[in-house]
Amino acid sequence: MLFRSKAFSHSLNQLNEGDELLIQFPMLHHSFFTTSLVKKARRRGVKIYFIIHDLDALRFMNGQAVPLKHRIRMKIQESGLLGAADGIIAHNPIMKSVLVDKGIAEDKIVSLGIFDYLIPNFEEKTGLSKNQPIIVAGNLAQEKAGYLYSLPAEPAYNLYGVGFDESRALENENYFGSFLPDELPAALEGGFGLVWDGDSAETCSGVFGEYLRYNNSHKASLYLASGFPLVVWKQSALSHFVLENGCGIAVDSLHELKATIDNLSDTDYQDLLESTKRIGKGIRDGHYLLTALNNLK
């Protein structure tokens, strides 16, 4: 850890007054030393910004897998390091409010809205309909996506990713295997992309499910950039973005999903597709990060 702190210190020392540095958070290796190094760089006139990918103290605050003393240490380190920055890019207004509650100045924080997702050689999907299977991409293991093993009989689901227990596959699940990130968008087939975590189809539950109340899942950006409207948990932070931008639907339970889709007219679905195309282009163009960076200054 000391070696890594020295390496980070050496990198910061290469920067001069007026230089700006954007750091992805959480850093792979950080400690209490990191906060003092950031403060030292700022005193020399270097601007330090963080873009948040995860808040581990928030993600694991109720999880028993992480010992209490480690959770307390995590919380102190996160608050100290983020508080030392010139500016922070949070996922959304809900995450921003959590950071303000931690004592970080509100005017230092901007909301990203949604993560960008660059797709080389993008080709627009055609022939999409509301009755095609629901797409689930990502970590399909029991501990992350246990709900996959207790889904209602309808609608059908197309699964892409690692960790899926094929011996427990349901009749309405089609597993396509895993793909390289650049190959995945072209491989996806379906009518909606699902953002759901936890062990229950009734609601998003457990450490990963509860975390959706605060964070923006990267898979949401994958789906939208690929041209698919979203299905999200109604209590997730992401539901606000989805409903305000008309790029998907929100449900409390996956047991409601078939009826919700059935109640959509073909015109309703086409409207979702048009909004998804608009949002997806912005995501592929890097619009959301560029806007957030401009709003920091």
Language-model features: locations:
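Short N-terminal targeting/anchoring amphipathic segment
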Residues: 12-33, 46-49
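Active-site proximal beta-strand in glycosyltransferases
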Residues: 20-22, 41-61
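A short, active-site helix/loop in glycosyltransferases that binds the activated sugar's phosphate group
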Residues: 60, 80-109
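Nucleotide-sugar-dependent
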Residues: 186-226, 232-240
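Membrane-proximal helix-turn-helix segments that form the acceptor-binding/catalytic region
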Residues: 10, 39-43, 67-88
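Conserved catalytic-core segment of nucleotide-activated headgroup transferases in glycan assembly
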Residues: 115-189
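A charged, aromatic-enriched C-terminal amphipathic alpha-helix characteristic of glycosyltransferases
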Residues: 126-127, 252-297
